[in-house]
Amino acid sequence: LLFQTYAYIGSRSIYSVVSILNRDIAKLKFVSGVEVTEEDYKLSGTEFQFPDLHLTPEQLGNRQKWIIESILRIWIQQPQVAFLILEYLIEFGILNPQYLIRKALDPDSNLIINNVSCMESINRVLSTCAVGESSKEVILLLFNLIVENLNYTLGKIGVENPETEEVKIITEFSEEDKNDTELMAKIDLQWLFYEYRGLLKTYLRKFNLQHSDYSKEIEDIFESIQNKPVKSDVMRLIKELTY
């Protein structure tokens, strides 16, 4: 409710949200479960200091997820506003970017594929994180989740030989077939698989990680791609980008 109140202020001006976040940063960090620093107390202009909650990783994660869900819920009709507010929460250190990335790549919603505002927001977050201290953690998480979603979607498509068979999208069907819910669901999954494959290659090109100090860890993640045609395609792209 607290974060929804701050998010609602965004209906007047997004800059009003930024101003209030800056003013109440100590309180908001405490509620979100992250560490409150001396600088945060100075910015908030308060001498009162919050107690250490000693949260477990699970408890911290739950708080971070509640923040994301509460803001997306209140701005369900204007996702661009919701994601912009979430970006500001990350900028102020109130929200860990990894939780937003997990939400964007949740296979139950596939927001990064289905919502343009989400993809644009994640791209901005990734660009910022890529030059920060948490770049390795964020990038590894990103690729790991994409590969997990590829494998998960592959399993749901029902390909006869999922490891060796190339996933093709059914593009020709009759008017009568349009009423076949099972067929239409399968085509949706084929497109989803295709979209995640494209997303993986896009981010590979974007970050050019072949010369990073964790390129081996990236390749290990790609080795877990279950569909060999996709794995071969990705590995070939890595070699092309290396030279």
Can you name each region flagged by the protein language model?
Residues 1-243:
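Long alpha-helical repeat solenoid scaffolds
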